[in-house]
């Protein structure tokens, strides 16, 4: 098993891209801005506290089993606050939406939503 911060499967292209000075600096600035501002939440638990506001909206929570950025516990806590959402855990994935398992679940969810009236 190879685990990186962004994904479960080693991606040579991603490593090369993150190693480019211009991209690395831009990404670091965005990440720092996000974290310095507390993710732009009014409290660390805002998402869970306000989940009741979206309980009437169909949703899918796609979570990589080996996500070290947003641990599995985060998805479980959100699902407990929003039980109507479909929680899908991808066994061989981390955090990146580009990982095959995550990507296929996101596309499937999008296809399901396309059929809603």
Which residues fall in each region the model found?
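Alpha/beta-hydrolase
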Residues: 1-50, 57
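Hydrophobic, well-ordered secondary-structure elements that form the walls
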Residues: 31, 67, 78
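Short, glycine-/Ser/Thr-/acidic-enriched flexible segments
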Residues: 66-67, 94
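Catalytic active-site module of serine/aspartate enzymes centered on a nucleophile-bearing elbow/loop
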Residues: 85-117
């Amino acid at each position: 098993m190879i685990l990186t911060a962004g994904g479960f499967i080693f991606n040579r292209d991603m490593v090369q891209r993150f190693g480019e000075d211009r991209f690395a600096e831009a990404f670091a600035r965005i990440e720092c801005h996000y974290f310095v501002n507390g993710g732009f939440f009014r409290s660390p638990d805002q998402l869970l506290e306000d989940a009741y506001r979206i309980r009437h909206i169909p949703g899918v929570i796609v979570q990589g089993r080996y996500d070290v950025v947003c641990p599995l516990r985060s998805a479980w806590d959100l699902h407990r606050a929003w039980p109507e959402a479909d929680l899908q855990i991808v066994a061989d994935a981390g955090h990146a939406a580009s990982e095959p398992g995550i990507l296929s679940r996101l596309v499937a969810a999008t296809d399901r939503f396309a059929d809603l009236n």
